[in-house]
Amino acid sequence: MSSFNTQNKNVLQTPIPAPTPQSQLKQFVIGGLAGMLSSAFTHPIDSLKVRMQLQGEGTGVGPKRGALKMLVHINQTEGFFTLYKGLSASLLRQATYTTTRFGLYDLIKDIVAKDDKPLPFTQKIMVGMLSGAGGAIVGTPADLTMVRMQADGKLPFNLRRNYKNVFDGIFRISKEEGIISLWKGCSPNLIRAMFMTAGQVSSYDQTKQLMLASGYFHDDIKTHLIASTTAAFVAAVATSPLDVIKTRIMNSPKTVTGELQYKGTFDCLSKTLRAEGFKAFYKGFNPYFMRLGPQTILTFIFVEQLNILWKKSQSYFK
């Protein structure tokens, strides 16, 4: 991000250089690449989280397995590599969702900035929410396909979708359910993405800015680790309930009468709350944070390193 790469102690008061079209495009590309690289490492944890979120759905009964027991159960019944199902969709999701939200964050921030000075944190939150919404709209089709591929092993054999890959999944959803169905669950996904980007990108931006301004930290790996860990925790607490709702809506089959299991975000929220209680919204929180923590840390470290490589390449070709 444009404000991520400053080493000035007085970063709170230092004007930010005016952005160029090339630098703005670079942030879209770097954001997407960083998201894809981190997702390749954390996808099995995300699959584990999805399975845990779907436990006892609609009834509140049935096995309540923790992360370790669920991992052992999946390994025994389906094999460990089942956790890599949906990886192609996960990579496409990062290529669309993360590319858009990271790129838009810098783009919008540069537009609303006054006198080339860093934005107040409240404005960063608003920018984060706007860029998250844009990312969700672009990334929902891949996200929907990923959730279905991850959850397929939980369904009875006759109900499994058996998508070959993300593109096969998107094609079949469009053909069998209509193109609009690719945005099934977009509402909770959009809300989640708004809170995620505000909690994740804005928190990282602000935490790093304050750390550098204190004079006790430098723009190095230690600062990046602390800032990204803080951002991961804030984002996980804020978005876990929305992630559970999103997962359930995206994975929900039609009932025997042909109706959808959930009419929308608030219907899913109320049904889940009545049947399972508030704790249901934090089902799978441990693997959620175990995945979001490393993914957030890796994403921002990759962003920082890719920015360094970009600067070196620019000086090399001058």
Curated annotation (Swiss-Prot):
Compartment annotation: Mitochondrion inner membrane
Main localisation: mitochondrion
This protein's record includes keyword Iron-sulfur: no
Disulphide connectivity of cysteines: none
Parts of the chain that traverse the membrane: 28-48, 79-99, 125-145, 185-205, 225-245, 281-301
SUPFAM superfamilies in the record: Mitochondrial carrier (SSF103506)
UniProt repeat feature Solcar, residue ranges: 22-111, 119-210, 219-309
Keywords: Membrane, Mitochondrion, Mitochondrion inner membrane, Repeat, Transmembrane, Transmembrane helix, Transport
BP terms from Gene Ontology: dicarboxylic acid transport; malate transmembrane transport; oxaloacetate transport; phosphate ion transmembrane transport; succinate transmembrane transport; sulfate transmembrane transport; thiosulfate transport
Gene Ontology CC: one annotated term: mitochondrial inner membrane
InterPro entries on file: Mit_carrier, Mito_Metabolite_Transporter, Mitochondrial_sb/sol_carrier, Mt_carrier_dom_sf
Family as reported in the entry's similarity comment: Belongs to the mitochondrial carrier (TC 2.A.29) family.
The protein's role, per its UniProt record: Mitochondrial solute carriers shuttle metabolites, nucleotides, and cofactors through the mitochondrial inner membrane. Catalyzes the transport of 2-oxoglutarate across the inner mitochondrial membrane in an electroneutral exchange for malate or other dicarboxylic acids, and plays an important role in several metabolic processes, including the malate-aspartate shuttle, the oxoglutarate/isocitrate shuttle, in gluconeogenesis from lactate, and in nitrogen metabolism.
The protein's name: Probable mitochondrial 2-oxoglutarate/malate carrier protein
Biological source species: Dictyostelium discoideum (Social amoeba)
